[in-house]
């Protein structure tokens, strides 16, 4: 046997005998080759052990290839093969005989570092990507066929909507021509007052409205045409993919083709990246041109006024996050850091919870179903509007044929609407409810990300070395089974903000669906006369002149009863001001208590007031259970908003506002009527001022004397705060500058609670720099005999005070009933303050000054921070506790060292720890976090050996032990008098070996490396991340082909967008140079253009851009999280449905400048010649004939559709109709020229064309059908039109 092997090896070397079917070999890295060879060696070693019981047949031998692969030699037939001849005895013959993960004879599973696992069929000498044991490919083909059938129905709905809107355009055109004719007749008869039936001004207004209606309908036709072409192109792509896969043998790609497709996808991705840069540059230039056009228009209207684009907002020029951490001293800084960390952790948990809820919610939503429901509902509304137009037509001037056609069309529309109402049942409402819940979760997620971003910036401000991130670094969503870094994942291809258009307003869509269903129920219970039905429908639906577009269907919020669907939960989750520090979301705002003595009336709650209420509720949560210092929170003297806690209960219960400041009033008034414009804006509800308690305060600063003049003038409606229980009750005002004010000023006491007039002026000596760190607190105090009671307070931040001007303003008073333990906020009188100062001076004569200065410095720093964060002043209760602790613990904390420098440092440390201890006294968890941070702070003072070092034990246990602190200099002295049980000194020097994180480092140590700081706290990836690979079904050939076509589609539309943007840029530049007012007005007023440039507006704040990036990252994380929930071995149906729906979703639309901004305006005043009037007659007649022809054609088409409905064949991909050229199939100019920039042309990729889509450059302006020759020669008689009083 050995001689036979040697002979075989010599024969092979001489004749170059190689296996007939070699595996594809790629040039890989040395490490990847070793792993692959090791896996193959292990597999064949196990196989050899399994075959060791059976000897090789006669004439067979074993050999190894150059890469270590074992093959077998048949010396009898002089052939080589990879198949072991003993497999016929050990392996099953067919797939039906396989058990578990077995493969039949002739099949082998292999692995490629770039592609991942694939399968080799040695019998057919082929390779494939799919696992032959799974039926996933068949399921995918069936899902593709079902979706194409549903997409065909959706396309038919779009085409039917196009036909209905085109009929509306014809009727609008006829109305415009009729009005134009009436205006010309009125101008001709203007000399005779008896012949003039109508006012020329009214005719001119009606003519303008009709022209706007025609223009609006043409724009809507353009949108529908684009939607149809986009859907057709997507369906053509899916058809071509299905036919290409079916044309392959076994419907699978081999490994060489898979590798080629992968390389092509990477090349297309590079082209996409470069093209996106070009698109962003074009959009930025469009923003500049739009701003320039706006400046020109404003300068033409009023050259004296300055342009708003040149104004800079100076409302807040302070970086709140960056300066808050620097202004705090040691103790307060760590207290704020610990509090912020807890809040940050709570928000992170809330974000993870929302992501999990969104991942669970996606499984209940069918991809692409929302678009179909939207088209179905909009089609119903279009038919309603067409029916209204037909009902408004006067039949007296019509011929019998026209009357018959109009009656038939009305009957057909009524039948269609009846069927549509029945189809729009509870299932559609439930689906829309799921989408509305998803939108609500997305809104919550956006608010959570915004709050987390603010907390993240605040944490970064505390320490420059700290870096926080809310994005996960794991790559769980990669669909490459080999996890190659260069592979494109599902999120890279199908989650693109520019690949889809603006999202659908699900709330508005659901309201429309509910309205249609309710209207159908009312019609079933109470049949209505057609005319009355028309009037009721007109009240709900918009008029033909509405600003309805396919992207953002408008609807008046008053029409759908916006407050009916609101819940108290929506009120609790109201977003607050952006500059307020967010609170953990688990907080539930307590219901406000109505004030006794105030008459509760059902006022409409203003949205600004609602924002204030939610701001106060979240500020309560910030203090972590401590009494809220709302008394120290000044109210803005500019807005003068009332306190939300003083609002009646009925007013709060009737609130239905949302986060939008342009809220909708719940009362129906003349101002809430939207009319025919489709634009709605409700007036704000004005709260009565007499229900609020107010105080008038004047402020003026004298720089030369250094004195603040405070004038307490008068008050108003103090009975809202307190009801006098006796006749001898009096009221006075008391004021003080906080913090640490030992004196206070007060006015005289008056018995008038309704409108007391004090007129007291006081001078407070204070320097200007200290004044800006203070807050003026004014309290309202009542006296009944010898008893005094504080009933309200006002606080004014002096940081906003302008010392150059004198102010006299009204301030709202916050009631003391809503502040727990309000007595502790009482300001000490002059005598009490003097006594407290005397006690402090007698108890601590030596160190009292230093302590008072340190405490004052800390509180002033806290006051500065509160001023920067807009009216979050420190609590007086906290200051009093700090002062009390200083007086009591002062002698005990005196250092026992003779060194004066060390004494000062130790006193400063004691003060810092004391301040922070008092601030964290409210929560045990916060106290533990603070003590931990304090230990790290004192332990990590780098290498300063002269600094006093506090012991490890807490201060509460220090009385039982030696209280002397351990100095770093004494730790190196053998004679230091320090007990052994207390000796614990850590020297963590910065950028040294001892600063490394305790534990096993995942990386090798490199001295002087730049990335050492990040290596210190490097965390290992969780084990669950590494186990996620190879748990799902790998990609099939259909998946691969869909990914490739998706990349090509994105590149095609990107090139189309670039071409349109370039054309738009050139037109706007010429208009800017020529100062064209029409183009400037279009650029400023067009909503679609405004949405487009808003994406790349450089004036957009960086926080919003970062928030959009975080939303994109979160969307990818949600997809990854959802994929991890798919059981092992089960197909991901939702992801595949999202893939195929990607092709029919409308992308980002670039607006096109209309060729004619307005129709030619008729001049009803000037006289025209008779020949032009006759031309108008004939044009009107031709339009009427065209309308009749279109109605008959639409009726025949609907009849054919009802008789021959579309049914797609199941189990196979539907065939394409005859190819017809469309504008969608014509490639646009491609600025990004690459070899793979154009999609792969296939014979099956023929577009599906709609009969309604014209090949004209402007399909929206569909040409009116030409009348027959008989109709042109028909003679028309003049008939008096009773609507307009003219002959037609």
Swiss-Prot record:
Start-end of Basic residues biased regions: 15-28
All copies of domain C2, residue ranges: 691-811
PROSITE patterns hit by this protein: C2, WW_DOMAIN_1, WW_DOMAIN_2
Location within or outside the cell: Cytoplasm; Apical cell membrane
Region described as Disordered: spans on this chain: 1-60, 541-560, 841-870, 890-913, 942-972, 1253-1272
Key words of the record: Cell membrane, Coiled coil, Cytoplasm, Membrane, Phosphoprotein, Repeat, Transcription, Transcription regulation
Coiled coil (residue ranges): 201-229, 335-463, 1049-1076
Sequence ranges of Low complexity compositional bias: 1-14, 29-49, 857-869
GO molecular function ontology, one term from the record: molecular adaptor activity
Entry keyword annotation includes Transport: no
Gene Ontology CC annotation, any one: Kibra-Ex-Mer complex
GO BP terms: border follicle cell migration; negative regulation of glial cell proliferation; negative regulation of organ growth; positive regulation of apoptotic process; positive regulation of hippo signaling; R8 cell development; R8 cell fate specification; regulation of DNA-templated transcription
Signal peptide residues on this chain, from the entry's feature table: none
Compositional bias annotation for Basic and acidic residues: 942-966
Biased composition range(s): Acidic residues: 896-910
Residue ranges, compositional bias (Polar residues): 541-550
All copies of domain WW, residue ranges: 54-87, 101-134
SMART domains: C2 (SM00239), WW (SM00456)
Primary location: cytoplasm
Function: Regulator of the Hippo/SWH (Sav/Wts/Hpo) signaling pathway, a signaling pathway that plays a pivotal role in organ size control and tumor suppression by restricting proliferation and promoting apoptosis. The core of this pathway is composed of a kinase cascade wherein Hippo (Hpo), in complex with its regulatory protein Salvador (Sav), phosphorylates and activates Warts (Wts) in complex with its regulatory protein Mats, which in turn phosphorylates and inactivates the Yorkie (Yki) oncoprotein. Kibra acts synergistically along with Ex and Mer to regulate the Hippo signaling pathway.
Quaternary structure and interacting proteins, as annotated: Forms a complex with Mer and Ex. Interacts (via domain WW 1) with Ex (via RXPPXY motif). Interacts with Mer, Sav, Hpo and Wts.
Protein family per UniProt: Belongs to the WWC family. KIBRA subfamily.
Descriptive protein name: Protein kibra
Source species of the chain: Drosophila yakuba
Lineage summary: Eukaryota, Metazoa, Ecdysozoa, Arthropoda, Hexapoda
Record gene name: Kibra
